From Swiss-Prot:
Protein name: Claudin-5
Predominant subcellular localization, coarse grouping: other
Gene3D superfamilies: 1.20.140.150
Tissue distribution: Widely expressed with highest levels in the lung.
Annotated segments matching region Interactions with TJP1, TJP2 and TJP3: 217-218
This protein's record includes keyword Cell membrane: yes
TM ranges: 8-28, 82-102, 124-144, 161-181
Intervals, Cytoplasmic compartment: 1-7, 103-123, 182-218
Membrane topology of the entry: Multi-pass membrane protein
Location in or out of the cell: Cell junction, Tight junction; Cell membrane
The keyword 4Fe-4S is annotated on this UniProt entry: no
Chain's gene name: Cldn5
Description of how the protein assembles with itself and partners: Interacts with MPDZ. Directly interacts with TJP1/ZO-1, TJP2/ZO-2 and TJP3/ZO-3.
Length: 218
């Protein structure tokens, strides 16, 4: 596969991952009510996200409420907000950088400089994926720990929501796509090729009697 095709494929994966990360950030499904034993007949389900919480009735009616106070939020929610939004914005910067250095655009003249710009964009996408993984894994760890904590009431136990799985898939796409962009750009960075020096021997000189000197023969 050519370097340009690698860059395009990587950019497509990064764009899909970016959209998935935006969905994960906005969906109020980072944790959902855990249905355990005696509360399985409950008439409502609670969803909680980074920006709002929703209550879904058994009739299908859903009511959501946006978090009004930032200071009243837990530390993990505040950190997840900051890191996820930061990853989304960094991915936007990576998009412009990658498009500037991509072989399919003419923003920069073809050459090593253009390839290094694309390489930087791919690296930024990979960093976005890693940055998004931090709040996702941190939040999931808290949900799992509280689920198995016997001191937490059953009514307050939650399970992993769909937004976490979407976020993990988006992070994987961002890192894989960033890696493909870097691979495609690395081919065009103008790095020196490995070669072996070629030695040339001087032509043999004839002697006075017209014969070649014996020392010229090996």
């Amino acid at each position: 596969m050519g370097s340009a095709a690698l860059e395009i494929l990587g950019l497509v994966l990064c764009l899909v991952g970016w959209v998935g990360l935006i969905l994960a950030c906005g969906l109020p499904m980072w944790q959902v009510t855990a249905f355990l034993d005696h509360n399985i007949v409950t008439a409502q389900t609670t969803w909680k996200g980074l920006w709002m919480s929703c209550v879904v009735q058994s009739t299908g009616h859903m009511q959501c409420k946006v978090y009004e106070s930032v200071l009243a939020l837990s530390a993990e929610v505040q950190a997840a907000r900051a890191l996820t939004v930061g990853a989304v914005l960094l991915a936007l910067v990576a998009l412009f950088v990658t498009l500037t250095g991509a072989q399919c655009t003419t923003c920069v003249a073809p050459g090593p400089v253009k390839a290094r710009v694309a390489l930087t964009g791919g690296a930024l996408y990979a960093v976005c994926g890693l940055l998004a993984l931090v709040p996702l894994c941190w939040f999931a760890n808290i949900v799992v720990r509280e689920f198995y904590d016997p001191t937490v009431p059953v009514s307050q136990k939650y399970e992993l929501g769909a937004a976490l799985y979407i976020g993990w898939a988006a992070s994987a796409l961002l890192m894989c796509g960033g890696g493909l962009v870097c691979c495609g750009a690395w081919v065009c960075t103008g790095r020196p090729e490995f070669s072996f020096p070629v030695k040339y021997s001087a032509p043999r000189r004839p002697t006075a009697n017209g014969d070649y000197d014996k020392k010229n023969y090996v």
